[in-house]
């Protein structure tokens, strides 16, 4: 097993060293979401490890290229409000697994998969302060296949964002020039709010069309009753 920090191929501009979370990010659960991607061997020769090693080296190189556009992913969560990036890079682990892809996929079982593909990524603190936004572990299977395990913070990386990142990484690994590029403008569109203050209750008058009158009256009553309690 080996561990390294993969840095963006180009240094991050000084003005981008801190990324402020948006209101939408604040509302997301502070949890890391795991994902496993399986890749079958190119050929049936399980001893062709030179080719596997070449692919792994290309994965690291292309990840470095991809992080140039996705620079917040290589940072750490600070105070639950910011992503601090200081060129430390993203945690990247390589491990060997003594099982084949067919053994894992023949009878899919999450517990078995977790045992055969142990995660050596850092333990996550409940507060997520100082925790890497994203961590990656690449497992070399004995058949020549590869299993890539990712753990990404749901505060900044939701499903569509994760898909965009993986597409960009794959495009870079293929040497394709059509890699998607993010813009990270959410903090401008949805500025942060102080969520520690209690929500103020206001009477809300609902006017519904296409519904029976008793439903509209009931909802108006519940709204006024809620605002008075």
What are these regions (language model features)?
Residues 1-229:
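Non-catalytic N-terminal regions of enzymes
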């Amino acid at each position: 097993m080996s561990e390294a920090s993969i840095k963006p191929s180009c240094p991050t501009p000084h003005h981008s060293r801190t990324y402020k979370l948006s209101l939408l990010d604040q509302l997301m659960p502070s949890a890391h979401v795991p994902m496993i991607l399986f890749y079958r061997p190119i050929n049936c020769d399980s001893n062709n490890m030179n080719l596997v090693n070449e692919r792994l080296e290309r994965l690291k190189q292309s990840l470095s290229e991809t992080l140039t556009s996705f620079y917040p992913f290589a940072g750490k969560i600070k105070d639950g409000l910011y992503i601090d990036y200081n060129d430390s890079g993203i945690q990247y682990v390589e491990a060997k697994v003594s099982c084949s892809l067919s053994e894992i996929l023949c009878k899919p079982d999450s517990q078995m998969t977790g045992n055969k593909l142990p995660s050596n990524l850092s333990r996550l603190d409940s507060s997520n302060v100082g925790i890497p936004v994203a961590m990656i572990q690449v497992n070399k299977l004995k058949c020549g296949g590869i299993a890539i395990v990712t753990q990404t913070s749901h505060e900044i990386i939701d499903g569509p964002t994760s898909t965009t990142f993986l597409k960009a990484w794959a495009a870079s690994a293929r040497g394709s020039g059509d890699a998607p590029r993010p813009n990270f403008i959410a903090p401008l569109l949805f500025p942060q709010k102080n969520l520690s203050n209690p929500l103020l209750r206001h009477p809300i008058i609902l006017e519904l069309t296409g519904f029976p009158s008793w439903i509209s009256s009931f909802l108006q009553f519940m709204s006024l009753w809620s605002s008075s309690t």
